[in-house]
Amino acid sequence: MIRSHRRSAPVRGIAVMCEKYLRAWHNDAFYEFDRNGEGFAIQCFARWAGGRTLTVWDVGAHHGEWADAAHAAMPDAHVTSFEILPPVAELLAARHPDAAWLTIRNIGLSDSEGSVDVTWNKDHDSTNAIAPRSTSKWFASSDLQTIACPVSTIDQLIAQGAPPPDLLKVDVEGHDAFVLDGAKQLFTGDHAPHMIQFEYGDTWIPAGRLLHQTGAMLAAAGYKFGRLYPRHVEFRDYSYGDENFRMGNIIAVRDAGLMALLSGQH
């Protein structure tokens, strides 16, 4: 019935309403920090960590919105923010002129050292990307500039003496899997992050990556992972149905107590 009448106005209307429902159900492309679960995840981590001294890495810092929230929840933690584009890094520094708790590094992270071309979308600069969604509405009639930027890896920076992160957040518009690939030694070592947050969604399509690949790597390192919702993380084994490219955040942890907090069990 539905297949045979998919062009009819009532059936099309039902499909539109169902898609709206599913977007909300999946917490898809919802960026209000205090309502999409990101604030909840930080609060859970802060509660679990107690008063211990923490190192936090914010990879893909943009203007520092996530770093500010992490600092508010964990004022004694030191946050290192990585912002690959020099113009955006300058704005980040201008917003935090005297922040002793914050170190800003104008460098990108990837799976190898070198240089990459980054598309700076001046009209929508939260969509800046190494592999941009160039056919999306965000890039239609936009003021774009390509900038060559240096990149390193998490493992390389730690080998050079950077303190390893207790909490690692990655939001780099589709390059997230490459950043995590560059931390394989960290993830399997004695100083692996207690919690990892990374963005997953249709930004991964131009980059040619799958959650299946990254999930397998994290699972091999002993992590459990799941999608972040406003008041819980749904930890579960990966299934092909999870490869839906709906924008959102994935949380990965190894500690059972932290997992229980994030699952909304306490």
What does each model-found stretch correspond to?
Residues M1-H266:
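Phosphate/nucleotide-binding beta-alpha loop and adjacent structural elements of enzyme active sites
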